[in-house]
Amino acid sequence: MSWQLPGPAWLFCPADRPDRYEKAAAAADVVILDLEDGVAAADKTAARKALAETPLDPERTVVRVNAAGTDDLAADLTALAGTGYRRVMLPKCEAAEQVTALAEYEVIVLIESPLGALTVERAVQSPNAIGAMWGAEDLVAGLGGNSSRYADGGYREVARHVRSSTLLAAKAYGKFALDSVYLDIRDLDGLRTEALDAVAVGFEAKVAIHPSQLAVIRAAYTPPEAELAWARRVLDEVPKHRGVFAFEGRMVDAPVLRHAEQIVRRAARA
């Protein structure tokens, strides 16, 4: 994949609201123009027209198309053919063949069904798959449930399992991973906790549903000054040692050095 991710704060924008496009692009690192769940069935034709007539920077835009096997996907692709957009998000992805059928596009697979959770490893191996995201709400609905989270806001075990499986599959095959949305717009503390966890385990970005969430996500991906200073100090020590060494009371080996390198890279992208 040659695409360099523009940043960690991504934002969904309904494709039938072209009045919001520029504002979304000004606020987010990447805008996901949504032709699927964010648009009512009666408004999808208008959404495709708006998408074609109101262009954004293709390097900072992804289009969420409709699911494989739907008439809406065919109409989406017809509309996209006349645009500069060549990166799409495929919702409810359940098979590698659904990804390779979109060979003209770079595809982010969205894992949000029981079958998708079981086939994510094969889907991300598709040559045109560049990343993976997971979604909790459709997943739980597909299981016959009605809540992805406990009362305290934490994910139930099945959602955590799919989150981890999606992350592992993406990273095992050299693709990026996006953490799912946080639906409680007012709960910025909960979002912060979840975004910090996404950083800690290796998600490259977290997707927002409201512009007010973007600053929280960016802050989570920006290393604290003390952490960044430590990372730089420990990396400066490497030429002075052979193999494992002790630094500031901590054993430093190859994994610790990789952690330090990740911190410095995140700071450079912030």
What are these regions (language model features)?
Residues 1-270:
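Expand to "…catalyze enediolate/carbanion chemistry for C-C bond making/breaking, isomerization
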